Design a protein with these regions (language model features):
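A general "terminal functional-core" signal
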Residues: 3, 57-291
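N-terminal low-complexity, Ser/Thr- and acidic-residue-enriched intrinsically disordered segments
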Residues: 1-56
Length: 291
C-alpha cells in the first residue's frame, strides 16, 4: 500500500466557487464516510493558507491585490496552501502521493489575470515552491479538464523542464488530426466523447511521453467538468475518473517513485463526486476497497 495524503480545508467546501466547484464538500465527505481516514496509510491534512510571498513566485503583486478585493481570497489561499503542503510532503517522502481538494479552479490563472473561476494557478505554484525549497527541477502536468489550460501554458511556455499535456476543449475530436504540438514539452490532445475514448486517448498519449521526459514528480489536474451532468463536454460518467487515476498513477510508479499529486475542485454534481472521490483515494493508497 501507498501512503496517501488528502489535503482539504472546510473553507474550500463552504466557500467554494459554487457554480464551478459543485461537489467539493460532498466529495471530501464521501472519502471520510467510506472509512479511508481510519486506514493507517491515508491521512487528512488541513490545507494551510499560502503566503503572499509564495503566491508571488508566479503572480504579480498587482494581481494579488486584485484578488484580495474579491470574496474568493481566503478560499484561494487555502487551495494554494493545500497544493504547497502536498508538494512538500510528497517530495520529502513523508507520503507517497496526494489528493488536493480545492475550492476554486486554477489553470486559467496567468501572472496578472485570470478567468473561469480561477484566481491563482494552484498546480503551477507547486513548481516554483518545489524548486525554491526542495531541490526539485523537472515536472509533468497532465490536465484532463474540458477547457484548455491557458494559464499553465502561458506560465511555463518557455520552461522545458515542465512537460504539459492538455486534453482540452479546443481540440475535442477523437482523431489524431486534432493534436497540437506547440513544442516537445507543450502539447494538446483531444479529450474523448465517451469513457472509452477518453481512456484510450490518455493511454495513448500520457505514459510514453512521461517515460521519455522522466519528471521527478507528476501533477494531474482531474477536471470533472467532463462529466455528463456537468457544464463542460458532458461526455463522461463518474466511472471514468478512477480509471484515469489508475493510468496516471501507474506511470508515476514506474517513472518517479510514485510521486503524484492529484488536484481537483470536484466540478461536477455531488452524485458524481461522491462516487469518484473515494475511488481515486482507493487507487492512490492501494487499499483494494473496491476491487
Amino acid at each position: 500500500m501507498k501512503k496517501t495524503g488528502v489535503f482539504y480545508h472546510d473553507i474550500c467546501g463552504k466557500q467554494a466557487y459554487s457554480s464551478l466547484a459543485m461537489g467539493v464538500q460532498e466529495g471530501f465527505e464521501s472519502i471520510e464516510q467510506e472509512g479511508f481516514f481510519t486506514k493507517p496509510n491515508v491521512k487528512w491534512f488541513e490545507s494551510r493558507q499560502a503566503t503572499e510571498a509564495e503566491i508571488g513566485r508566479l503572480h504579480s503583486q498587482q494581481w494579488i491585490d486584485e484578488v484580495k478585493k474579491t470574496q474568493w481570497w481566503t478560499v484561494s489561499l487555502h487551495s494554494v496552501g493545500g497544493m504547497l503542503g502536498a508538494t512538500e510532503k510528497v517530495l520529502k517522502g513523508e507520503i507517497d502521493n496526494a489528493l488536493v481538494i480545492a475550492g476554486v479552479g486554477g489553470h486559467h490563472a496567468h501572472r496578472d489575470s485570470a478567468w473561469g473561476g480561477c484566481y491563482f494557478n494552484v498546480i503551477s505554484l507547486g513548481i516554483p515552491h518545489a524548486r525554491a525549497t526542495l531541490n526539485t527541477k523537472r515536472f509533468a502536468i497532465v490536465d484532463t479538464d474540458t477547457h484548455h489550460a491557458d494559464g499553465v501554458r502561458d506560465l511555463f511556455m518557455k520552461d522545458d523542464d515542465v512537460l504539459h499535456i492538455c486534453f482540452c476543449n479546443s481540440y475535442s475530436w477523437d482523431y489524431d488530426t486534432a493534436d497540437r504540438m506547440e513544442s516537445s514539452t507543450k502539447m494538446c490532445f483531444p479529450h474523448g466523447s465517451s469513457d472509452e475514448t477518453e481512456i484510450r486517448n490518455v493511454e495513448r498519449e500520457v505514459p510514453a511521453r512521461i517515460k521519455e521526459f522522466k519528471p521527478e514528480m507528476i501533477y494531474w489536474l482531474c477536471g470533472m467538468d467532463t462529466h455528463q451532468d456537468s457544464y463542460g463536454t458532458q461526455a463522461l460518467t463518474e466511472k471514468c475518473y478512477p480509471k484515469l487515476a489508475k493510468i496516471i498513477k501507474g506511470v508515476a510508479d514506474e517513472v518517479c517513485q510514485g510521486k503524484l499529486i492529484v488536484k481537483t475542485c470536484f466540478n461536477a454534481p455531488p452524485h458524481a463526486t461522491r462516487y469518484a472521490a473515494p475511488r481515486i483515494v482507493d487507487c492512490l493508497a492501494e487499499t483494494g476497497k473496491y476491487s
